[in-house]
Amino acid sequence: MIPIVVEETGRGERAFDIYSRLLRERIVFLGEQVTNDSANRIVAQLLFLEAEDPEKDIFLYINSPGGSVYDGFGIFDTIQHIKPDVHTVCVGLAASMGAFLLCAGAKGKRSSLQHSRIMIHQPLGGARGQATDIRIQADEILFLKQKLNTELSNRTGQPLSKIAEDTDRDFYMSPSEAISYGIIDNVLNKKPVSVL
C-alpha cells in the first residue's frame, strides 16, 4: 500500500501518493530491484524533472539490492545525459546495480546515510540451452562486466585492475570505506535544526 499525503491549498485539500509528493520536491526514490518497470519509471521522472527545470538539481534516493544491468544502464545513461546535476543518496543498501547508480551521481553530490551498506560485484547470469547459446550469453556477461568495471574505474578513480579484483566476489563497504573507494563523496548525518 502506498501512503497518501493530504495537503491544504487555497482551493481546499489535495491528496497525493507519497512518491508524487516527493517528485514535486525533485526527489526520485528507487526502493526496489532495478527492473524494466522500475527503470522506465525512474527515467521518466528524471526526464520530467529536467523538462520542468533544467537548472535545478535532482535527488535520487537509492535502497536497492541491484537488478538488471541493461535497465540499470538506462538509468545511468539518463543521469549522465540530462542537464541537472543528480545527487545520489544511499538509504539502507545500494548493492550491485544499486551501487553502480549511487556512483553515477554528480561528483561531490554522491552520499550515503551513516548506517547504509554499499556492495559491488560482477554481473550475475544464468544460461541454459545449447552450447552455442551458452557461449553467446557468457560472452555478453563478460562484455557487461568489462563495461561496468570501466565505468566504475572512471567514476571512482580506482585502477581497472583493482575494480576487476574487488568485483570478482561480493565486496561490501561502509559509507566511510565507500568514500575512500570513490563511490561516494560524503556521509550524511542529521540535518541541522534551525532555531527561530
Swiss-Prot record:
Asked whether the keyword Ubl conjugation is assigned, the reply is no
Compartments it resides in: Cytoplasm
Its keywords, alphabetically, are: Cytoplasm, Hydrolase, Protease, Serine protease
What does the record list as GO biological process? Answer: protein quality control for misfolded or incompletely synthesized proteins
Sample GO molecular function, one term: ATPase binding
CDD domains given in the database record: S14_ClpP_2
The EC designation for this entry is 3.4.21.92
**GO-annotated cellular components:** cytoplasm; endopeptidase Clp complex
Q: Where is the active site?
A: S96, H121
What top-tier enzyme class does this entry carry?
hydrolase
What InterPro entries does the annotation carry? Answer: ClpP (IPR001907), ClpP/crotonase-like_dom_sf (IPR029045), ClpP/TepA (IPR023562), ClpP_Ser_AS (IPR018215)
Instruction: Tell me yes or no: is Magnesium among this UniProt entry's keywords.
Output: no
Which PANTHER family does the record match to this protein? Answer: ATP-DEPENDENT CLP PROTEASE PROTEOLYTIC SUBUNIT
Family from the record: Belongs to the peptidase S14 family.
Tell me the subunit arrangement.
Fourteen ClpP subunits assemble into 2 heptameric rings which stack back to back to give a disk-like structure with a central cavity, resembling the structure of eukaryotic proteasomes.
Recorded protein name is: ATP-dependent Clp protease proteolytic subunit 1
Source organism per UniProt: Prochlorococcus marinus (strain SARG / CCMP1375 / SS120)
